[in-house]
Design a protein with these regions (language model features):
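Generic structural signal for residues positioned in beta-strands
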Residues: 29, 47, 59-62, 97, ...
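Catalytic-pocket segment enriched in acidic/His residues
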Residues: 205-289
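HotDog/MaoC-like acyl-thioester-processing domains
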Residues: 2-16, 68, 91-179, 253-256, ...
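A contiguous, surface-exposed recognition patch within enzymatic or periplasmic domains that forms
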Residues: 3-51, 166-222, 229-232
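Phosphate-binding glycine-rich loops and adjacent basic patches that engage nucleotide phosphates
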Residues: 23, 71-78, 149-154, 183-194
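Hydrophobic, proline/glycine-rich low-complexity stretches
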Residues: 2-109
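Generic structural "secondary-structure junction" signal
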Residues: 50, 63, 93-94, 100, ...
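Amphipathic, positively biased hydrophobic alpha-helical segments used for protein targeting
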Residues: 42-46, 73, 118, 150, ...
């Protein structure tokens, strides 16, 4: 089955160029989708949701342009890139790395160079990794993303199992900062307006097909909450200090649940973080590493 989903020979040749654009409206809508502005009187959030004054894109918005470009490759049969063809129900977002290589503009036209990085045989499943470099119209690199997909049923071709990813364990001490924030019951419906239209996050009947009693929150929405919390608690709420974020998605979140971001400072520029679902005591995000600029 895996051979039908992943053709390493073809995948290794991938150097796909995709395009996308966004405006200040998209930037503000994304910020609302990851909880900014839930208190309209909170001055610290206004710069991310109100286009006048000192308007900024949230750093984790850097995942959206390339994500939407990748989603444009979806066909009626599912996700379809050279060397990989899998239906959406076979794909799980395993890990995400996002790095800002220039100040994030509040509107832009971008080109995204998509390169295949690795595929590992975790029979009967597989892990596939892509790297995406995004440049503006002048050719300047704006952001870089690495996406790791867990492909259900995609393994079994006898390939390399790959390295065991080192766990990033929180220090054995109390967190340096904790932010607790309840998501809205319609949080997934709001976040999906940024481009991820997967019915798993909107259609109760569709969600039940995958064992959930109701739609779940997008993993990248939880990712956005964590990035916003770290920026606020550890970087003085200054998006210019935010360099990169890497996480592993561990547990689904249901809209309306409470996210608890726990943060530990390590050195001058590194933060270890995790996201706990308060109501169930489950870690939704593990192995969080966020880097700031010097």
């Amino acid at each position: 089955m895996g051979a039908k989903m992943i053709d390493l020979g073809e995948a290794s040749k991938v150097e796909l160029v995709l395009e996308s654009s966004y405006t200040s409206r998209d930037v503000a809508l994304y910020a609302l989708g990851v909880g900014a502005g839930s208190d309209p009187l909170d001055d610290s959030d206004r710069r991310f949701v109100y286009e006048r004054g000192e308007f900024h894109a949230l750093p984790t918005f850097a995942v959206i342009p390339q994500s939407n470009a990748m989603l444009s490759t979806i066909t009626p049969t599912g996700f379809n890139l050279p060397g990989m063809s899998a239906s959406l129900e076979c794909l799980l977002h395993g890990e995400q790395y996002t790095e800002l290589r220039a100040p994030l503009p509040t509107s832009a036209k971008l080109k995204h160079l998509v390169r295949f990085k690795n595929a590992y045989d975790k029979a009967p499943n597989a892990v596939v990794e892509y790297g995406i470099t995004s440049v503006d119209e002048s050719g300047r690199q704006i952001m870089y993303n690495e996406i790791s997909f867990f492909v259900i049923g995609g393994g079994g071709w006898g390939g390399d199992r790959g390295p065991s990813a080192p766990a990033v364990s929180p220090p054995d001490r109390a967190p340096d900062a904790v932010i607790e924030e309840k998501t809205a019951p319609n949080q997934a419906l709001l976040y999906r307006l940024s481009g991820d239209w997967n019915p798993l996050h909107a259609d109760p009947a569709f969600a039940r097909r995958f064992g959930f009693d109701r739609p779940i929150l997008h993993g990248l929405c939880t990712f956005g909450y964590l990035g916003r919390h770290v920026m606020k608690a550890m970087f003085g709420n200054d998006p210019r200090k935010f360099k990169s974020i890497k996480v592993r998605f561990a547990e689904p979140v249901f809209p309306g649940e409470t996210l608890v971001s726990r943060m530990w400072r390590e050195g001058d520029t590194r933060v270890i973080a995790e996201t706990i679902v308060k109501e169930r005591g489950k870690a939704a995000i593990k192995n969080g590493v966020i880097e700031s600029r010097d």
